[in-house]
Design a protein with these regions (language model features):
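Active-site flanking loop/helix segments enriched in acidic
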Residues: 25-46
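Residue-level signal for well-ordered alpha-helical scaffold segments within enzymatic catalytic domains
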Residues: 26, 30, 53-60, 105-109
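Alpha-helical phosphate/pyrophosphate-handling elements in metalloenzyme active cores
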Residues: 39-66
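Divalent metal-dependent catalytic cores for phosphoryl transfer on phosphate-bearing substrates
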Residues: 63-136
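Conserved small/polar residues in nucleotide/adenosyl-binding loops
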Residues: 137-144
């Protein structure tokens, strides 16, 4: 058995994760330290902050608390297995399977394992909409007069 130790001190095998292994403190801590976009931003922007922004946007749109929670948790698996940028992730089918399995366990823990296809598409919509401005604004936000 290959175990990981979480921020809270719990030990478990992420390949055999159960809903009882899920602790929001572990997810929140890890996501707060994980930079979006592989760190290729003008300033540090955590996956945790992005998740909060997605949930806040869902609330602003008048979506249900269930949908807000789904938005908050949409990257929660990355709290256990980190993040890989989208252009690379699509080529890693084994990683995608592991990520999906862990995400399913997390959703079960929070009572969201029965999300409809429409509900899943809604959080993906916000994720994409919030991702785009970060990609374009933060990646290109600085101009430098330094020429080497």
């Amino acid at each position: 058995m290959n175990t990981m130790t979480t921020y809270s001190g719990r030990k478990f095998d992420p390949m055999q994760m159960t809903p009882g292994d899920v602790y929001i403190e572990d997810i929140a801590h890890a996501l707060s330290l994980l930079c979006r976009g592989g760190g290729q931003l003008t300033y540090f922007y955590s996956v945790g902050q992005h998740s909060l922004n997605c949930a806040t946007e869902a609330k602003a749109r008048g979506w249900s608390e269930r949908q807000q929670l789904a938005c908050l948790l949409h990257d929660a698996s990355e709290g256990y297995i980190s993040d890989i940028i989208r252009p690379v992730k699509i080529y890693l089918s084994n990683y995608l399977e592991i990520e999906s399995k862990i995400m399913g366990t997390i959703l079960t823990h929070f009572g969201l394992d029965d999300l409809t296809e429409e509900e899943s598409c809604r959080w993906k919509q916000i994720d994409d909409e919030i991702l785009e401005p970060v990609s374009y604004t933060h990646l290109r936000a600085h101009e430098t007069s330094l020429h080497l």
